[in-house]
Each structure stands twice: as C-alpha cells, then as structure tokens.
C-alpha cells in the first residue's frame, strides 16, 4: 500500500469525523432543554413581592375596634376599646354596651355642661356623644363614686390622671329643684380610698378599679334623703297651743270666738300630759267642759258650760270668761306630727280649721241647739228667781205677823 492510499484514507476519516461533529452540533441546537425557573413562578414571585410591600403600610382601620353599642355599632380607638373590655369584666356587666351606658351616665354632668342640653338618663339615640379623648386616654371616675344623676345625686367628677388618682370635685346640680348638701358629698369623696394604679410607664388599661354594687349605692342614697327630710321636718317651727273661747250669748257677737294662747306653765303641763297619755296608749276626750261660777246669774250668761279644745287633761282657769254653749266640733285630741306641705302654716292647724268648718256647716242646727240651751238656762233662772221671790214674801209676811 503506497503513500497516496494512506493519505486518502486519512482524509476520509477526517471527513467522517467532521461530518459527525457537524451533525452533533445541529442536533444540539435543535434539542429542547428544560429551564430551571418557569415563567409562571416568576410572575407569582413578582406579585408576592408587591404584596409584602403593601402589607407594610397600615391603614387607619387597623387602629379602630368595633364595639357593640345600643342598637348600633360604634367605632373607637383601640386603647379605649381595650379599656371598655376591661371595665366590662371588672364591673361584671353583661355586654360592652352596658359599660358604655354606665360611662355615659357617669359623664352626664360634663355632657350637660359642654352641650347645654341633655336628658336624665341620657338618650343615647339623640344625644351627640363622641367618645374621643385627647392624648389617647379615657378618664373615668372611681367605682365607689357619689350616686348618679343631678337631682338624685347628680354630681360632676374630675379624675386627675397625672397625680395617680384621688382628686375629685363634687358639684351638685339643682336641675329639678332638689337641695342636697354639698359639703356632705365633698367629705364623702375625700374620705374615699385612692385608686390603685400601675407606674406611669405601663399601659393605662392595666389600672385597677374596685367593683361597685349600684343597688347598695341607691339604697344608701335613699336612706340619706329620708334622714334629711326627717331633719327638715323636725327642725320646722311648731305651732303654739291655743284655746277657743266663745263670747257671751247676749253680747251680739254671734258665733264669733277667740283663740287665746295657753300660758307657759300650762303649755309645759300640756306637753307632759300629752306625753303621758300617749305612753299610756289611750286618747283624751276631744272636748272638755269648763263650768262658770254659780254666782254669775246677773251677768246674763248664766251657768252655761263652754266647751274648749283640749289635747290634755288639765283644768284651765277660765272662770272670768262667760261663754255660750256653742259646740265648736270635735277638735284634735292629740297634737299630730307636724308635716309642712309648702303652706304658710303647719298641718296641725288644718285639723282645727276643718273642725270649725264642720261646726259651721251644720248652720241652723247648731244655732237652734244653742238657742234651746239658752232658753232652758233662762227658764231655770226665772224659776229660781220666782222661788226666791216667793220665799222672801213668805218671810216678810211671817215677820209682819
């Protein structure tokens, strides 16, 4: 084999090798190679990155919490809502709306002072009340506070947050005409225990308040009002005891009578006697007759008995008065407790006026009885005078014989 043949064989092998390599390059370009990240995953990654970017921005809605109100839902800051939740647990309320109602009742004086209007209790549907607080704090009075509502103890409380609790100002409100003792409420507030607080660096919602029983407060308020009413009744002026004296029958005064004051000694005796009668458990007779002296026939009144009002059982010296047997009615036997009803006179005098009215309402019957009694007395006196004349005549005749 010569040298030319060897060269031809080498060229053929090179051509084959070259051709095979070219086919491999073509096949490699035409082959499909899978990619490491599909296009869908890249799109999801892009959207997730934008979502994380948007979550970093907090909207204003996240800072508010919905709390159930009275018939509707209201919005308030989260710190206020947290405080409302805590108060609901501490006060034992059934819902947060009840706690909000309690807070509005406590703030009623401040609402009236700020708006100039308000109802007692507050009308939540029409009253424009915004539970927004400056400085993200909600000031509330302590649980053991002065009773609720102005005329029923309506007071205004101011709680000092910076001082740690303990400064309260009670101002009574004369909205409905009730008069309360301001000094008594102030002393009561000053004697109350201060509110326990956590140091200022911690959350406001962790302040602790004592639980309150509103029913006990209402009972205490009613007892205090009853005591004040009793004190005002007992401190009122008492009516002086008076005697009703009828005029002589022939004086022409008609049914006129006089009211004479009882002397001091007689008044003391009357009080002691009335106390004894009350203690003994029996009532004195409503009418006491006082008979005039027997020797007063020439005075014209005769020995007629005059009836006086008597709440006691002692004899009153009235011999110098000659009265007609005018029945003045059944007066009060025992002095009734004085109850002022806003009139210029106590009610103890009203019983006397009622008795006089009933006496005069009988009209002609009382006058007829009085005239009959007067006629009987005059007839008796005439008989006595005639008997006396007959006796004197007989004596004169006997002496002449």
Curated annotation (Swiss-Prot):
GO molecular function: DNA-binding transcription factor activity; RNA polymerase II cis-regulatory region sequence-specific DNA binding; transcription cis-regulatory region binding
Coiled coil region boundaries: 364-389
Residue span, TCP domain: 60-114
Pfam families: TCP (PF03634)
InterPro entries found in the cross-reference section: TF_TCP_subgr, Transcription_factor_TCP
Listed Polar residues bias regions: 1-13
Principal localisation: nucleus
Region (Disordered): 1-20, 34-70, 182-245, 362-401
Location in or out of the cell: Nucleus
Domain of life: Eukaryota
UniProtKB keywords: Coiled coil, DNA-binding, Nucleus, Transcription, Transcription regulation
UniProt keyword Disulfide bond, yes or no: no
Any single biological process term in GO: regulation of DNA-templated transcription
Regions of compositional bias (Basic and acidic residues) in chain numbering: 210-233, 378-401
GO cellular component: nucleus
Amino acid composition bias (Low complexity), ranges on this chain: 42-56, 365-376
Subunit structure: Interacts with PP438/PNM1. Interacts with SPL.
Its job: Can specifically bind site II elements in the promoter region of PP438/PNM1.
Name this polypeptide is given: Transcription factor TCP8
Organism in which the protein naturally occurs: Arabidopsis thaliana (Mouse-ear cress)
Lineage, opening ranks: Eukaryota, Viridiplantae, Streptophyta, Embryophyta, Tracheophyta
């Amino acid at each position: 084999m010569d040298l030319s043949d060897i060269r031809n064989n080498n060229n053929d092998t090179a051509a084959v090798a070259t051709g095979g390599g070219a086919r491999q390059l073509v096949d490699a370009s035409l082959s499909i190679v899978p990619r490491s990240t599909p296009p869908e995953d890249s799109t999801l990654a892009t959207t997730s990155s934008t979502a994380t970017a948007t979550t970093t921005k907090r909207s204003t809605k996240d800072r508010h919490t919905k709390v159930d109100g009275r018939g509707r839902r209201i919005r308030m800051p989260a710190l206020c809502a947290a405080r409302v939740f805590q108060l609901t647990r501490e006060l034992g309320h059934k819902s947060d709306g009840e706690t909000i109602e309690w807070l509005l009742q406590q703030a009623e004086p401040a609402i009236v002072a700020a708006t100039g209007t308000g109802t007692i209790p507050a009308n939540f549907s029409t009253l424009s009340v915004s539970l927004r607080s400056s400085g993200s704090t909600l000031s509330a009075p302590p649980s053991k506070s002065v009773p609720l509502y102005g005329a029923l103890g309506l007071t205004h409380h101011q709680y000092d947050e910076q001082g740690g609790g303990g400064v309260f100002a009670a101002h009574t409100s004369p909205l409905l005409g009730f008069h309360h003792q301001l000094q008594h409420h102030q002393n009561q507030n000053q004697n109350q225990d201060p509110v326990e607080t956590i140091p200022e660096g911690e959350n406001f919602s962790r302040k602790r308040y004592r639980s309150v029983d509103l029913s006990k407060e209402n009972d205490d308020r009613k007892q205090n009002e009853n005591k004040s009413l009793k004190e005002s009744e007992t401190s009122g002026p008492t009516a002086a005891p008076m005697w009703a004296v009828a005029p002589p029958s022939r004086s022409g005064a008609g049914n006129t009578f006089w009211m004479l004051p009882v002397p001091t000694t007689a008044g003391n005796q009357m009080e002691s006697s009335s106390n004894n009668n009350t203690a003994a458990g029996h009532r004195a007779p409503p009418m006491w007759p006082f008979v005039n002296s027997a020797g007063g026939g020439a005075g014209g009144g005769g020995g007629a008995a005059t009836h006086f009002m008597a709440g006691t059982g002692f004899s009153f010296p009235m011999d110098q008065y000659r009265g007609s047997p005018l029945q003045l009615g059944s007066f009060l036997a025992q002095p009734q407790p004085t109850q002022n009803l806003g009139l210029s006179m106590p009610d103890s005098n009203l019983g006397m006026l009622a008795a006089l009215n009933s006496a005069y309402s009988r009209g002609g019957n009382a006058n007829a009885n009085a005239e009959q009694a007067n006629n009987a007395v005059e007839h008796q006196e005439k008989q006595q005078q005639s008997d006396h004349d007959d006796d004197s005549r007989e004596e004169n005749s006997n002496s002449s014989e």
